[in-house]
């Protein structure tokens, strides 16, 4: 296993017959059975591989509408040993119940909380899981309907890097969370119950890095191939960091480029007007523009490797046209068939 489980528990939050949200609390942690270990390992892998996560931190409580600190206070109590895990998770469930009660659309679910270690960091994983209906075939070949936890479609989940939180209280990225298909608004109530405030605009930082890289190669004496090699090295470094669950460190990236003969990127990126943080999470979707050009509009979708620009793909901004040399075989076949009237 890639994780070492310390504690895990599940509580249920659901609507009663009067439509009120109620908690059904489990009185003891889950046993570390094979089923529990398999579930948490799967969730860890699924969550770590989710693209486009947001990052934040615990806000402060105040009279001006700032974040509620009850969750972080309870977590602090647990980490100090003042609260047991069951008591802490029960308080968290009550907080989530109170938050869900504010919304008409709330259906509740199963609140899973787990403390575990991965690599050198301790984490608290928090997810609101839903049950999904499925069919199974019994021994007598009759069909039976049952419910199971939908682990492949988690939309309301967050992970707190406890190690970073305790080591650097000024950090603004020790909480990661899934934004959901419709953006952050879907997860507002889930973040609010934890008192989480978004701290790092991951997409903006990644796009700023790309902007800095493009300006850097444009102002250099590198050849066309060397410029693309620089972009590829940046993409590879950032992708490796994303896959490992690590942040992009601009100084570390600059050292990687310097090893390939591309010096001074750190001074260029951090000494200019880019407002680039020293470190920030990677967003692979944004970084793909270092290797590919792509766009969609007016019924046309086009995508090609950046190295083809100026060779197989010629762009003329004056006439607003793109010339493609060497049409892909499968596309050429479709076009030829259409021209022949087939």
Swiss-Prot record:
Q: Name one GO cellular component term.
A: cytoplasm
- InterPro entries, per database record: Nucleoid_associated_NdpA
| Keywords, in A-Z order | Cytoplasm
List the Gene Ontology MF annotations in alphabetical order.
Answer: double-stranded DNA binding; single-stranded RNA binding
Q: Where in the cell is it found?
A: Cytoplasm, Nucleoid
Q: Name one Pfam family in it.
A: NA37
Which family would the database say this protein is a member of? Belongs to the YejK family.
HAMAP family given for it? NdpA
Protein name, entry field: Nucleoid-associated protein Sfri_2491
Instruction: Give the organism, scientific name.
Output: Shewanella frigidimarina (strain NCIMB 400)
């Amino acid at each position: 296993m890639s994780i070492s489980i310390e504690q895990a528990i599940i509580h249920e939050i659901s609507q009663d017959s009067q439509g009120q949200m109620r908690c059904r609390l489990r009185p003891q942690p889950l046993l570390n059975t094979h089923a529990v270990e398999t579930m948490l390992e799967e969730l860890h892998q699924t969550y770590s591989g989710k693209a486009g996560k947001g990052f934040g931190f615990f806000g402060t409580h105040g009279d001006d509408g700032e974040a509620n600190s009850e969750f972080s206070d309870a977590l602090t109590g647990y980490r100090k040993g003042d609260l047991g895990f069951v008591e802490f998770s029960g308080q968290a469930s009550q907080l989530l119940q109170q938050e869900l009660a504010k919304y008409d659309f709330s259906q509740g679910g199963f609140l899973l909380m787990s403390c575990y270690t991965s690599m050198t960091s301790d984490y608290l994983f928090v997810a609101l899981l839903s049950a999904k209906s499925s069919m199974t075939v019994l021994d007598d070949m009759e069909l039976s309907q049952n419910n199971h936890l939908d682990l492949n479609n988690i939309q309301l989940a967050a992970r707190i890097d406890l190690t970073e939180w305790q080591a650097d209280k000024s950090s603004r990225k020790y909480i990661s969370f899934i934004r959901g298909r419709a953006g952050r608004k879907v997860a507002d109530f889930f973040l609010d119950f934890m008192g989480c405030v978004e701290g790092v605009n991951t997409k903006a930082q990644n796009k700023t890095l790309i902007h800095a890289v493009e300006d850097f190669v444009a102002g250099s004496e590198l050849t066309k191939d060397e410029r693309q090699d620089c972009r590829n090295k940046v993409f590879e470094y950032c992708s490796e960091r994303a896959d490992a669950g690590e942040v992009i460190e601009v100084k570390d990236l600059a050292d990687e480029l310097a090893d390939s003969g591309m010096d001074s990127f750190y001074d260029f990126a951090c000494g200019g007007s880019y407002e680039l943080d020293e470190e920030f999470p990677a967003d692979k979707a944004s970084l793909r523009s270092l290797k590919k050009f792509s766009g969609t509009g007016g019924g046309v979708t086009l995508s090609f490797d950046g190295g083809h620009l100026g060779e197989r793909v010629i762009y003329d901004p004056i006439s607003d046209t793109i010339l493609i040399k060497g049409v892909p075989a499968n596309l050429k076949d479709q076009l030829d068939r259409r021209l022949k009237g087939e």
